[in-house]
Amino acid sequence: MSTKNNSNVPEISDEEFYKNRLLTVTEQLKDNVQVYPHKYEVNYRFKDIFTFKDASEEDLKKVKVQSAGRILNFRIHARYSFFQVMSEDFTIQLVVDAQVLENKDIISNIKRGDIVGFSGVLGRTKTKEFSVFIKELSILTPCLRTIPTDYYGLKDPEIIYRKRYLDLLINKESKNRFIQRTNIIKFIRKYLDDKDFVEVETPLLNIIPTGAAAKPFTTHHNELKMNLFLRIAPELYLKKLVIGGMDRVYEIGKLFRNEGIDLTHNPEFTACEFYMAYADYNDMMNMAEEMLNGMCKYLHGSEKIVYAPNKREKEVKPVEINFARPFARFHMLEELSKVVGIKLDGLNINSDETLDLLIETCDKYEIKVEQPKTLTRVLDKLVGHFIEPKCINPSFIIGYPLVTSPLAKNHRSEAGMVERFELFINGKEICNAYTELNNPIEQRMRFKMQAQDINDGDDEAMITDEDFCVALEYGLPPTGGFGMGIDRLTMFMTDAANIKDVILFPAMKPESDN
């Protein structure tokens, strides 16, 4: 049996292929050919077709299907042609008999990447491959450009991030990673819904950029004639809802921070925050353990995972991460006391002498701290150097001085400290939580402390929100609050070494700027 020209991989350049295909489509449109039909009736999705895979030959012949998908590969022969068609996560073979097909010309017109509609009956070939034996075949959407082949794949990070649609078509690993991301969010929602939390939405455009220590994005509202800020955190809005009687609330949504981009930071990212009345940070720790342990078992069937990032980041070595409870705990000041040689506590940490000692320690270990060298910034750098690398398995860092946490409640037994923790996995922050400060008098004092840092040049210090202080005067019950970055968590759950690999369309410079 003779074989005609196989156009799986064009023998001409990509540009020539594009020009030729565009010319063909343009001429068809001029001739009023329906190149892009409005609709195509699908009576069986591919996953439904595959439910018949083990049926008998006699039963298969009774199943008439009409479906659609994208051409991956094909072989054209004198009479029989074979097309591999993909839809969602399934690929099926179409067997086309030129003597049966009404529109025979279509066979020579089909190119790799075309989206086709087809109808026929199910069956098996002589080699027992489950297939659809075609009666009708039509092109629903022509592919005007060449798609990279499975053999060579799509490996250039620039193309992967800028043309995610190609990445999803070619790299099954990428598609599975984003499906897992969806599963992670579904798990979080179900976990909170099952505990009677109510999902809410709070504004993305804020008058005051507060709720976290970060640089905001600025925009302008033409009608109101005022500048607004993209939210850096929904925290204060959510606590207002608790004041309003919504005892358990959560939000999953976008946050924006006008800061650097690296392997674990993107200026637009997704987070989950929840607030629970009559709870404290101990309850938040229990819930963090319960949620992450359950999520790991749900996604991987085990409490342990081997974080083996994708091969593009060759310097990242596989690491075993154990989500078994209880998670480890590191007290910030106790750990740093071992480094600086004196006992640090919530009282002496605020002295000028202690700050000088901490700065000297940074200099000794060549730890860079940007100006102004506030206590909060210095502690953050020291924790990042000495404590975070110990947190391979999920670990809580507790023991935060009051000055570092303007929205957290004073510690009930450690003077000068607050009831706060941050959860780290493989040395990266995933969660931040605390017993919420609900004393309006104390909250105003904390905001004044932050205002002093702003005056000293700290552009990440928190801005005073008087409206929130007024809301606190109506009474916020004892409350535990929790925030978690979904992108970083997804990285560890899906073997991604770069945060861009878990964000469908990450922030990128325009190609003309490169």
UniProtKB/Swiss-Prot annotation:
E.C. number(s) listed in UniProt: 6.1.1.6
Keywords of this entry: Aminoacyl-tRNA synthetase, ATP-binding, Cytoplasm, Ligase, Nucleotide-binding, Protein biosynthesis
EC category name: ligase
Protein family membership: Belongs to the class-II aminoacyl-tRNA synthetase family.
GO cellular component: cytosol
One Pfam family matching this protein: tRNA-synt_2
Reaction(s) catalysed (UniProt annotation): tRNA(Lys) + L-lysine + ATP = L-lysyl-tRNA(Lys) + AMP + diphosphate
Cell compartments where the protein resides: Cytoplasm
The UniProt record lists the keyword ATP-binding: yes
Subunit structure, as described in the record: Homodimer.
Keyword ATP-binding among record annotations: yes
Main location: cytoplasm
GO BP annotation list: lysyl-tRNA aminoacylation
GO molecular function per UniProt: ATP binding; lysine-tRNA ligase activity; tRNA binding
Protein name: Probable lysine--tRNA ligase, cytoplasmic
CDD domains: LysRS_core, LysRS_N
Lineage of the organism: Eukaryota, Fungi, Fungi incertae sedis, Microsporidia, Nosematidae
InterPro entries referenced in this protein's UniProt entry, alphabetically: Aa-tRNA-synt_II, aa-tRNA-synth_II, aa-tRNA-synth_II/BPL/LPL, Lys-tRNA-ligase_II, Lys-tRNA-ligase_II_bac/euk, Lys-tRNA-ligase_II_N, Lys-tRNA-synth_II_C, NA-bd_OB-fold
Signal peptide start and end residues: none
